[in-house]
Amino acid sequence: MSFQRHKKHVISISLGSSERDAKATVVLGEQELLVERRGTDGDFAKARQLMEECDGKVDAIGLGGTDLFVYAGDTRYTFRESAKLIAKVRNTPVLDGSGLKNSLERRLIAKLAAEKIVDFKDKKVLLVCGVDRFGMAQALQEAGAKLTFGDLLFGLNVEKPLYSLESLAWWAKLLAPIVTKLPVSWLYPMGKEQQKRTPKFSKYFLENDVIAGDFHFIRKFMPESLLGKIIITNTVTESDCKMLKQAGVKLLITTTPCLNGRSFGTNVMEALLVAVKGAKSSLTAAEYIELLERYEIESSFEYLND
């Protein structure tokens, strides 16, 4: 029996580099989806224009290169600059990946531990930014990892590593009302800055066994050698994989699956799942997990060096 696939369109509009643009066709069940990523090289006006042009013409929009929200304990703060990007989008759901991160990444860490792919017990883990991956942070702690959070190191250029979820939550509650009003570019590499390497606070990379979190932070600040390290991240291209291999990375784990030779950002995957569901807003954690399991969407593992 044949069927007519219902084609849907998901687009991620990113403040990141246009050099990382990609396009892929994905089939989930009986639905075919065109998934694409378009970077604006840090141009907020262009990103806002693209958002408004796509409103009502695609099934879901991913917001990349920035976060819309950050969480401090149970309080959610909105990045003022990011909110302006989507202020006039009325008809198409916009997803920044935060809704999916908690469920997808928590599930991944539990799976890695359960299947003994990575034994986190007493393993030293650097999470380059914990506030945008609190679910991953909690899962790592539950798995027995010894955590170092790089939020102040890499986000604010302050040499103060944090070593517990409690201290991370305390600092987040103190600083979130302030930093969410600052230009995003002060906190996060975007546009051409994503392609520049400026190693910083290298000792925290070197003294940890696992480096986890946002790849743009990892790529920008990592030292030349990461011999024997495990990287848990997302949004890597083929050239990124080659760079990590040359750096001596042992195992690369991407939280999102590879499509056409690269892993897309969490915002893309969240938008894809919302589009498949036909929803007009973000889903619940249970709904995300159900869709991930139904369509057998799995993370990617690649041993780069023996």
What name fits each language-model region?
Residues 2-122, 143, 212-213, 227-235, ...:
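Metallocofactor- and cofactor-centric catalytic cores in central/energy metabolism, strongly enriched
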Residues 18-22, 70, 135-136, 157, ...:
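Short, charged/polar "capping" segments at the starts of alpha-helices
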Residues 66, 130-133, 215-218, 235-239:
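Short, polar loop motifs at secondary-structure junctions
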Residues 100-163:
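Conserved beta-alpha
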Residues 156-163, 240-247, 261-268:
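Short, charged, surface-exposed secondary-structure boundary motifs
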Residues 157-217:
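Active-site rim beta-loop-alpha module in soluble metabolic enzymes
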Residues 221-224:
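Short, T/G/N/S-enriched strand-turn elements that build extracellular solenoid repeat scaffolds
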